[in-house]
């Protein structure tokens, strides 16, 4: 039985990328390549992703847009608070985390950004409901701050407001970026279009739970956070058409992967619709839909590291991360990327070529 410690590794802190590169496709790409001799790792630039794709493949992107979900403010008593909006419930109401010396009570008001008051509603552990006096999204975008991940240590600036969004972000609602998509730009899309690689889009609003640590050693006891996703009939048809011509389904990011596998049917088709997913993918999971994955490097002991280990094989991921650390790749949200293909169930524990 795998435990939390099986997904731990030592990462030099200087390898945690603190800012994005000026050129999106200038990040590095670690591609895992398999042949009869084992697994090998290619050190490339992200623009070289085209060398690992084929005409007829379908790239599936998450088009969620990060909202300015963080606020600082105070209670009527003067006590300081920090608010992180987790989810938009309706035009005027949100779910939010509140950091305060004492939890606010229902019916009280909070002053946010020294600009407007919100009313505290019923609590839904671990969140509070907050009622905004005007359309919440408008006030969030006007007065909020971009919610950079906790391991990025600078105050967000105008550069972050551009680079912590994908170029195709269009559906507001996330509090963390689908970071594998940060590496794509219009020039790369033009090259992919020219070679016959297709694009599809879904929406999964990434919640702050993506950064929540796993607190139990027995990972089977972990309970995943829930996130909202939507899959269009157009994407479901694109999946069907791709399969019909022998193309591969390539998930861009773990959020796309989670949405696709949540909506995948036993026959390999995709069900259109929307809903909540708390899917927890760990080694032993049998993937129904996704053939390849573009992803960043993930935190030790994280559910996302478990997901990529389930997909590519635990030993492959361990070897890939050792290689990446030795080669000084940049890690986490603003870091470099990997290209992985799905391991067959009977090869997920196979050892990669030790010479890599």
From Swiss-Prot:
As for family, the record states: Belongs to the QueA family.
UniProt pathway: tRNA modification; tRNA-queuosine biosynthesis
Q: What chemistry does it catalyse, as a reaction equation?
A: 7-aminomethyl-7-carbaguanosine(34) in tRNA + S-adenosyl-L-methionine = epoxyqueuosine(34) in tRNA + adenine + L-methionine + 2 H(+)
List the molecular function annotations (GO) for this entry. S-adenosylmethionine:tRNA ribosyltransferase-isomerase activity
Q: Identify the enzyme class.
A: transferase
GO BP field: queuosine biosynthetic process; tRNA wobble guanine modification
Which species is listed as the source?
Ralstonia nicotianae (strain ATCC BAA-1114 / GMI1000) (Ralstonia solanacearum)
Q: Where in the cell is it found?
A: Cytoplasm
Q: What residue range is the signal peptide? A: none
**What function is annotated for this protein?**
Transfers and isomerizes the ribose moiety from AdoMet to the 7-aminomethyl group of 7-deazaguanine (preQ1-tRNA) to give epoxyqueuosine (oQ-tRNA).
- The EC number of this protein is 2.4.99.17
NCBIfam families, sorted: PRK00147.1, queA
| A Pfam match | Queuosine_synth
Gene coding for it: queA
Q: Which UniProt keywords apply?
A: Cytoplasm, Queuosine biosynthesis, S-adenosyl-L-methionine, Transferase
Q: What is this protein called?
A: S-adenosylmethionine:tRNA ribosyltransferase-isomerase
Q: Please describe the quaternary structure of this protein.
A: Monomer.
Per the annotation, which location comes first and is thus the protein's main one? Answer: cytoplasm
Q: Which GO terms describe its cellular component?
A: cytoplasm
Q: Has keyword Cytoplasm?
A: yes
Q: Which InterPro entries match?
A: QueA, QueA_dom1, QueA_dom2, QueA_sf
């Amino acid at each position: 039985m795998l435990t939390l410690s099986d997904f731990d590794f030592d990462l030099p802190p200087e390898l945690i990328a603190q800012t994005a590169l000026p050129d999106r496709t200038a990040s590095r790409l670690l591609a895992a390549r398999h042949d009869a001799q084992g697994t090998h790792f290619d050190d490339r630039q992200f623009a070289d992703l085209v060398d690992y794709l084929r005409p007829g493949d379908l790239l599936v992107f998450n088009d969620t847009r990060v909202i300015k979900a963080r606020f600082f403010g105070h209670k009527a008593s003067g006590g300081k608070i920090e608010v992180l909006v987790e989810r938009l419930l309706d035009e005027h109401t949100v779910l939010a985390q509140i950091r305060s010396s004492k939890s606010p009570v229902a019916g009280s008001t909070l002053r946010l950004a020294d600009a407007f008051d919100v009313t505290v509603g019923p609590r839904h552990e671990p969140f509070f409901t907050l009622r905004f006096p005007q359309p919440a999204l408008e006030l969030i975008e006007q007065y909020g701050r971009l919610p950079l991940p906790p391991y990025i240590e600078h105050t967000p600036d105008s550069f972050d407001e551009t680079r912590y969004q994908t170029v195709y972000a269009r559906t507001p609602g996330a509090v963390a970026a689908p970071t594998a998509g940060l590496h794509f730009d219009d020039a790369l899309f033009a090259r992919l279009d020219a070679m016959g690689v297709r694009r599809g889009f879904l929406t999964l609003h990434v919640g702050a739970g993506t950064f929540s640590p796993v607190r139990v050693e027995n990972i089977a006891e972990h309970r995943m956070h829930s996130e909202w996703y939507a899959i269009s009939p157009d994407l479901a048809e694109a999946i069907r058409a791709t399969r019909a011509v022998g193309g591969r389904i390539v998930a861009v990011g773990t959020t796309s992967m989670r949405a696709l596998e949540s909506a995948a049917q036993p026959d390999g088709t995709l069900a259109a619709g929307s809903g909540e997913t708390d899917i927890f993918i760990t080694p032993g999971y049998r993937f129904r839909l996704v053939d390849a994955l573009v992803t960043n490097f993930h935190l030790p002991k994280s559910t996302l590291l478990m997901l990529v280990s389930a997909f590519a094989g635990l030993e492959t991921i361990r070897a890939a991360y050792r290689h990446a650390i030795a080669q000084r790749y940049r890690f986490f949200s603003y870091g470099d990327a990997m290209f992985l293909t799905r391991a067959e169930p009977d090869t997920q524990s196979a050892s990669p070529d030790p010479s890599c």
